[in-house]
Amino acid sequence: MAQSRLFFSADKAEAERTYNILEQAFEDDGFPIAITEIDEDRQIFEVSVYVEDDAEEVAARVDALVGPGLFDTEELPDIDWVTHSLEGLKPVRAGHFFVHGSHDRDKIEPGDIAIEIDAGLAFGTGHHGTTAGCLELIEETVETEHPTNALDLGTGSAVLAIAIARLAPIPILATDIDPIAVTVAAENAAKNGVAEHIVTATAEGFGHPIFRSYSPFDLIVANILANPLIELAPSIKEHLAPGGSIILSGILDSQHDAVLAAYQTQGLTHQKTLHREGWVAIHLK
């Protein structure tokens, strides 16, 4: 199937503004949209939209949204671009967590909480600033609050669920709307020796009957996107145990206040925000 990438580079503020516009406009279309730092010294970021077959139509929509001629288009070979894009990435340290591919096992140091996630069909390897922030908040929250169960909503590769399980042998429900992600999540849980603690399920939002068996949750983590997080605020609060914690990410710096307000409206209290590489992770109770 023909694949194309529409891409545009700019300074951080302009790239984030453009990413926000496209993320909201294409939310229901299923096109992967990414923002990546390509020049650390000059703080230049690249926004990419990945499409199949209908590149001209999508390019016209992009031009109408952000202005004509800003985005270039390139044809992509028929390869697994998630795997390809992660091949050159280094392992990531977040708190005591060390997220790595199988080729970097030799870099594990004494005291590391190692999580092995190879690139594949599901996103969420820990290389993203948004995931790293979640991992740091998870370590702090689990060690201080001692939750008895947890939910990883939009689990992707299950890196967050695995992190919780590595810290505490508690029941963890890991859900995603993508059945491929759910399969990968289960495989990764087994690879990391925590499959007995993690139940995976394909579920959109909280409509699946499995939630009735596991909720309320002492800890809910959700590393998805700002708009779905805002829409899900009432349901997430409904499934949170009294005194429980919520950790949210997948949120750009510029989206922080809107997401926080949605949860404060539900009666939750802001505990902390971590800023990592243009992304934020929010802890509420």
Swiss-Prot record:
InterPro entries: Ribosomal_L11_MeTrfase_PrmA, Ribosomal_PrmA_MeTrfase, SAM-dependent_MTases_sf. It comes from the Bacteria. Keywords: Cytoplasm, Methyltransferase, S-adenosyl-L-methionine, Transferase. Its main location: cytoplasm. GO terms for molecular function: protein-lysine N-methyltransferase activity. Pfam families: PrmA (PF06325). It catalyses: L-lysyl-[protein] + 3 S-adenosyl-L-methionine = N(6),N(6),N(6)-trimethyl-L-lysyl-[protein] + 3 S-adenosyl-L-homocysteine + 3 H(+). Its EC number is 2.1.1.-. It is an enzyme of class 2 (transferase). Gene3D superfamilies: Vaccinia Virus protein VP39. One of its GO terms (biological process) is methylation. It is found in: Cytoplasm. GO terms for cellular component: cytoplasm. S-adenosyl-L-methionine binds at T131, G154, D176, N223. Belongs to the methyltransferase superfamily. PrmA family. Methylates ribosomal protein L11. This is Ribosomal protein L11 methyltransferase. It comes from Brucella canis (strain ATCC 23365 / NCTC 10854 / RM-666). The gene is prmA.
